[in-house]
Design a protein with these regions (language model features):
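Non-heme Fe(II)/2-oxoglutarate
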Residues: 1-77
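Intrinsically disordered, low-complexity peptide-like regions
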Residues: 12-15, 30, 82, 96, ...
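Structured loops at beta-to-helix junctions and adjacent beta-edge loops in soluble globular domains
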Residues: 25-27, 36, 88, 121, ...
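A ubiquitous, low-specificity "background" feature that marks scattered single residues
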Residues: 38, 104-106, 178
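Catalytic core of non-heme Fe(II) oxygenases with the double-stranded beta-helix
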Residues: 68-147
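Catalytic core of Fe(II)/2-oxoglutarate
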Residues: 123-189
Length: 189
């Protein structure tokens, strides 16, 4: 993957434009449209109403990234929505504390979309932190090749203090009891 092909992730918590992505499967089948339509301002939606195909579909990138098919094979017949590769720049990459509150269907309950992270490239100096409702926080060190479910509706932040860019393959998967059981088994290994 060429870093120049990654699109800046438009958001007010993308400090210094150091968070970028590519779409493998997403809205309109466009490699550089990394957000959901719900994240766009109403004026943009009106202006682009006729231009955009809002269906979720694969982009040409899907066939070019073997890790995607490997991960999709692991997931088997789980229904999935968006698939993205998100990069957090080395040394300066930071996502300020935020929630993904526009993802109203996110979660681990039946029929909700569980956001799974599969680190493709990372380093020990990448720090992910998530806050709970009681104000306590948890830090996660996600290793390459591991699978993580993260509830992005909770406040969270990510910082890359390392000397290597961080790349995560992120897939939104339709949740059910089988997925919850599978995630529990995966976490026990």
């Amino acid at each position: 993957l060429n870093i120049d092909d990654f699109a800046n992730h438009y958001s007010n918590y993308n400090k210094g434009n150091t968070w970028k992505g590519m779409v493998v499967r997403g809205y309109g089948g466009l490699v550089d449209f990394i957000v959901k339509p719900a994240e766009m301002v109403n004026s943009w939606k009106k202006e682009n109403k006729e231009k955009m195909d809002w269906k979720v579909k694969d982009t040409p990138l899907r066939k070019q990234v073997p890790a995607v098919e490997k991960f999709a094979d692991i997931l088997g017949d789980y229904e999935h929505e968006r698939i993205r590769i998100l990069m957090l720049k080395e040394g300066e990459g930071e996502l300020e504390r935020h929630t993904d509150r526009q993802d109203v269907e996110a979660g681990i309950g039946d029929g909700q979309w569980a956001r799974l992270h599969f680190p493709l490239q990372t380093n020990p100096k990448v720090e992910f932190k998530q806050w709970n409702a009681d104000g306590t926080s948890t830090k996660c060190k996600m290793g390459e090749g591991e699978l993580w479910y993260l509830d992005m509706r909770k406040p969270h932040t990510a910082v890359n203090f390392g000397e290597q860019d961080r790349y995560h393959l992120i897939i939104d998967v339709k949740s059910d009891q089988r997925l919850r059981d599978w995630l529990v088994r995966s976490s026990e290994k």
